[in-house]
Amino acid sequence: MNRIHAVILDWAGTTVDFGSFAPTQIFVEAFRQAFDVEITLAEARVPMGLGKWQHIEALGKLPTVDARWQAKFGRAMSAADIDAIYAAFMPLQIAKVVDFSSPIAGVIDTIATLRAEGIKIGSCSGYPRAVMERLVPAAAEHGYRPDHWVATDDLVAGGRPGPWMALQNVIALGIDAVAHCVKVDDAAPGISEGLNAGMWTVGLAVSGNEFGATWDAYQTMSKEDVAVRREHAASKLYAAGAHYVVDSLADLPEVIAHINARLAQGERP
């Protein structure tokens, strides 16, 4: 049938870890532990969605971080420096990712709704396999069990913004056409991943990295603050090319109904 057959979901900030705090906090700690260099949470969020080694590399190229690094060491960050920060990052992330494994509000019900419509649930992450092997069973204990998952270091071709993790889900799930898939993500590299794979793309403006608030903080925010943060996040996701932007995964079934209507009319991503 000419309809959506699969969704490929990101993890942190999309299905678990409202606000995507597990990786951002660990980047701050890893820079401090490896080289006694301070970075802010806001800086740590900028390259979110990339593989973690590539994320550290991108952080080193941020003008503010590069200026601090140059002031301390008199040179730009090297590949060996990135390796050292990554070596500090990995055990910290593996140790703490389970603490951020609870599904975001609405995720479990949304997955049930999608499966009732015959939609398969794929997933992929900027986390490496060593982290995912801790996160996946922890999320399963909370009730979130996708049909397939791919880690950023699983494939020789690489991770985001390339299409390969999303396409590996297509293969594993046996989907007949990429136009029958939706890639859902809270960060720009994940939107690019979906577009490069030829899929429909949905950005999440409130639950994830760009909004950047904990669930408790979000619950107590003024409507004005929410609106400003939502607009900031949505603008970045639309700029990345997202076909749709909604607040969280709870809004996805309505979007899929809209996409199905477009597919029925012969439209493609």
Swiss-Prot record:
Pfam family, any one: Hydrolase
EC number: 3.11.1.1
SUPFAM superfamilies registered for this protein in UniProt: HAD-like (SSF56784)
InterPro entries found in the cross-reference section: HAD-like_hydrolase_sf, HAD-like_sf, HAD-SF_hydro_IA, HAD_sf, PGP-like_dom2, Phosphonoacetald_hydro
A GO cellular-component term linked to this record: cytosol
Cofactor note: Binds 1 Mg(2+) ion per subunit.
Cofactors, names only: Mg(2+)
Record: residues binding Mg(2+): 10, 12, 186
Record: active site: 10 (nucleophile), 52 (schiff-base intermediate with substrate)
Family: Belongs to the HAD-like hydrolase superfamily. PhnX family.
Annotated PANTHER family: PHOSPHOGLYCOLATE PHOSPHATASE, PHOSPHONOACETALDEHYDE HYDROLASE
Subunit structure: Homodimer.
Function: Involved in phosphonate degradation.
Protein name: Phosphonoacetaldehyde hydrolase
Source organism per UniProt: Salmonella typhi
